[in-house]
């Protein structure tokens, strides 16, 4: 009888140990702590929203941020790589193609998050080096006071219509990550190609530093229509500003902006915990609150978005992220020649 009781205790103890291994650190394990530096292009208002949440959930982790546009972050990383190391533990920028380049160069840590199974499968790197963390949708924005319903552009090519001459704008792909991948995608598209940008140039397109600058000029009336992210329009509309958004029928650009852990991180445990948080429902709610679609199909759409991301994907512009990752300078040089000079 005593032997049976001892066996029972051993089985229970083994089960508890197994459960602890599956669900998290074993009882008595040291809490994850230390500094985590995140390089990101995510909006400052989302960072400010996240700071108290992260502090409450992870009191022993000092989460620090370097904020800048995607191209600014990439420039910083390249400079740090040349010096031999980077201060970044995690990166979150809006250029999926760049993560392919980092993966090829051995700069990312392989990590299969337990939250990967909740994401759209094609937005998780098949080898586990990164995954989407937020969605950006590039489409067409317009000033409701300047554009009548009958004149609304329906396709990307409509931006080249002479009636918008001098009144159409776009963010600069040399400075903005979302503008770069949108430009690269359209340039590779058989329906568009570089002839689309040649047509925009003939229509006196205004090239602004970023999406925020395009939004500002649309609201001031300097522009009537333009290439802009859905999240800019949703946020502006929530504040009562007269902006509308159109998903071009010839393919909105859907950008699964990723998150990845740098291979050189000195705090893998903390970096993984923060990575997991961003892919959790709580972390993704902050993304949705920031007017962007979630990478999880079980999350709601941003407030007042006309379509769910699963529906936008059905007619989105096809994107070859691997090919785009191999020709960033070629795309930027071509755009510079056609549009900026």
Question: What does each model-found stretch correspond to?
Answer:
Residues 121, 136, 197-201, 207-208, ...:
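Periplasmic-binding protein-like
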Residues 257, 262-319:
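Mature extracytoplasmic/periplasmic domains
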Residues 304-341:
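Extracellular/periplasmic bilobal clamshell ligand-binding domains
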Residues 31-64, 140:
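Short, polar/charged alpha-helical segment
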Residues 97-101, 219, 224-242, 291:
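A ligand-binding cleft/hinge motif common to bilobed small-molecule-binding domains
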Residues 10-21:
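Bacterial N-terminal signal peptides
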Residues 139-146, 183-187, 255-268, 286-287:
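A bilobed periplasmic-binding-protein/Venus flytrap-type ligand-binding module shared by bacterial periplasmic
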Residues 41-48, 68-71, 86-222:
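Extracytoplasmic ligand-binding site segments that recognize negatively charged/polar headgroups
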């Amino acid at each position: 009888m005593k032997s049976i009781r001892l066996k029972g205790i051993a089985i229970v103890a083994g089960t508890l140990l197994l459960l602890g291994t599956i669900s998290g650190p074993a009882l008595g394990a040291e809490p994850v702590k230390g500094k985590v530096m995140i390089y990101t292009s995510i909006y400052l208002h989302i960072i400010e929203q996240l700071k108290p949440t992260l502090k409450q959930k992870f009191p022993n982790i000092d989460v620090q941020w370097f904020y800048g546009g995607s191209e600014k972050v990439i420039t910083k990383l390249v400079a740090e790589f040349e010096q031999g190391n980077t201060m970044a533990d995690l990166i979150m920028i809006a250029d999926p193609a760049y993560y392919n380049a980092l993966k090829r160069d051995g700069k990312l840590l392989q990590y299969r998050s337990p939250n990967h199974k909740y994401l759209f499968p094609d937005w998780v790197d098949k080898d586990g080096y990164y995954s989407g963390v937020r969605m950006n949708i590039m489409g067409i924005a317009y000033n409701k006071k300047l554009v009548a319903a009958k004149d609304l552009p329906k396709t990307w090519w409509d931006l080249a219509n002479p009636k918008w001459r001098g009144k159409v704008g776009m963010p600069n792909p040399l400075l903005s990550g979302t503008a770069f991948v949108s430009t690269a995608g359209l340039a590779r598209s058989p329906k568009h190609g570089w002839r689309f940008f040649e047509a925009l140039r003939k229509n006196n397109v205004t090239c602004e530093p970023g999406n925020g600058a395009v939004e500002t000029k649309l609201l001031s009336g300097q522009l009537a229509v333009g290439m802009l992210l859905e999240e800019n329009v949703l946020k502006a509309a929530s504040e009562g500003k007269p902006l509308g958004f159109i998903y071009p029928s010839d393919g909105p650009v859907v950008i699964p902006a990723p998150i990845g852990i740098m291979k050189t991180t000195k705090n893998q445990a903390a970096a993984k915990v923060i990575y997991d948080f961003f892919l959790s429902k709580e972390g993704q709610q902050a993304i949705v609150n920031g007017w962007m679609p979630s990478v999880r199909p079980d999350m709601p759409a941003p407030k007042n978005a006309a379509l769910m991301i699963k529906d936008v994907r059905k007619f989105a512009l096809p994107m070859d992220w691997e090919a785009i990752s191999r020709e960033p300078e070629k795309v930027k040089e071509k755009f510079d020649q056609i549009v900026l000079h």
